[in-house]
């Protein structure tokens, strides 16, 4: 392993994530928060829910009650006046269903003088859920979507119609109270109704789109689920104010700044990366190989969210798969590619992403690993683990997509 490039990669990752932690962003958004005089209740859902709720309560001083539902391992302590719950992600589970019921109970019977402060971040689609189909069926549909290669907008178009809280329905539960929503974006282009499936946003998608997506990916659905896909979601809400804060562009900007501080010339390729993970990795590897050996320190940055079409039975995540796919192009070069999820988790693993450099492919061969067979089995985790290429950050408290960087010396 090229220890110099790995050290630079770790520093860039740390600086980038620190720049997009939600604490300051939530406080800025609350400058426009003006309760009407009644009760103020807090509901937070998503991978960054605890961090956002903690910042909000510190800024406000107190709330009259609250519920946080976040991913396992993401609650970092007690928040005064708020009950915190952990649940399953990316597949919803019974703990998430129960926590959502607690949130719904909290907002029942409110008046027009009351306010619900709704803090939303990526991961909310799985974590904040009251299914309209049996829980086991929803889990099965979620697994089908995850394995299909469907993008997040397609997935959430389906999930909205199978839920009693998504697609604007949570805001309807809160009425006549006002909902003040602060959203940390994890979807390219910041479509509010798709982030965590838009529990407090009118739905822009149509039932015809949902039915087409189900057909496109050959989803195995019950008659009940098919009937729900054919029903429309709320198209207008009059009790919601929404502010978006944080995005993948901020993550990319922070990464570029960190690269410059380490002496690299930074080039932002895109903040809308959306393709197969291994295609993105091969592309970044090819860019790095083209520019290696020219005597210039360069950093090529891409932010977004790739997808993985599961065909194998291995372990990994989109960022690990992206990194591993870059390894062949980097072989023998003084260059590296790394990719991380800003939330600190990549797929169903304990890693945030992966790192490879010009020495990785040879190290994999020595360990009895073939890059292409490993990718075909979707087993990037074990391959990178064998050569020290896993990136572990732990839960970060934020969630604004992924960032991938190619470094050239």
Residue ranges and their predicted role:
Residues 43-45, 67-70, 117-122, 181-187, ...:
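Short beta-strand segments
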Residues 134-220:
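Internal gly/pro-rich beta-alpha loop/helix module
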């Amino acid at each position: 392993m090229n220890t110099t490039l790995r050290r630079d990669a770790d520093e860039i990752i740390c600086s980038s994530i620190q720049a997009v932690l939600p604490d300051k962003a939530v406080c800025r958004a609350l400058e426009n928060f003006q309760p009407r005089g009644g009760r103020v209740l807090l509901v937070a859902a998503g991978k960054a829910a605890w961090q956002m709720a903690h910042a909000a309560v510190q800024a406000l001083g107190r709330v009259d009650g609250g519920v946080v539902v976040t991913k396992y391992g993401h609650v970092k302590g007690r928040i005064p006046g708020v009950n915190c719950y952990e649940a399953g992600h990316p597949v919803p589970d019974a703990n998430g269903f129960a926590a959502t019921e607690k949130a719904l109970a909290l907002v029942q019977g409110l008046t027009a003088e009351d306010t619900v402060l709704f803090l939303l971040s990526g991961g909310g689609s799985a974590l904040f859920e009251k299914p309209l189909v049996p829980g086991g069926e929803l889990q099965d549909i979620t697994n089908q979507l995850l394995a299909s290669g469907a993008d997040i907008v397609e997935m959430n178009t389906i999930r909205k119609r199978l839920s009693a809280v998504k697609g604007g329905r949570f805001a309807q539960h809160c009425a006549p109270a006002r909902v003040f929503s602060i959203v940390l974006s994890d979807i390219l282009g910041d479509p509010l109704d798709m982030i965590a499936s838009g529990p407090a946003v009118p739905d822009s998608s149509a039932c015809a789109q949902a039915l087409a997506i189900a057909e496109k990916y050959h989803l195995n659905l019950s008659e009940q689920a098919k009937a729900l896909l054919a029903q429309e979601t709320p198209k207008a809400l009059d009790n919601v104010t929404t502010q978006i804060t944080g995005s993948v562009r901020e993550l990319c900007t922070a990464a570029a700044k960190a690269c410059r501080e380490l002496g690299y010339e930074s080039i932002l390729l895109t903040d809308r990366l959306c393709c197969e993970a291994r295609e993105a990795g091969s592309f970044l590897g090819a860019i790095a190989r083209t520019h290696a050996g020219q005597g210039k320190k360069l950093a090529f940055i891409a932010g977004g969210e790739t997808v993985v079409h599961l065909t194998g039975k291995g372990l990994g995540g989109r960022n690990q798969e992206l990194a591993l796919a870059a390894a062949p192009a980097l072989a023998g070069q003084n260059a590296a590619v790394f990719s991380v999820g800003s939330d600190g988790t990549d797929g169903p693993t304990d890693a945030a992403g992966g790192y490879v450099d010009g020495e990785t492919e040879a190290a994999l061969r020595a360990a009895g690993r073939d890059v292409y067979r490993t990718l075909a089995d979707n087993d990037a985790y074990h391959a990178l683990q064998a050569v020290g290429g896993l990136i572990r950050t732990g839960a970060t408290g934020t969630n604004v997509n992924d960032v991938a960087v190619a470094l050239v010396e």
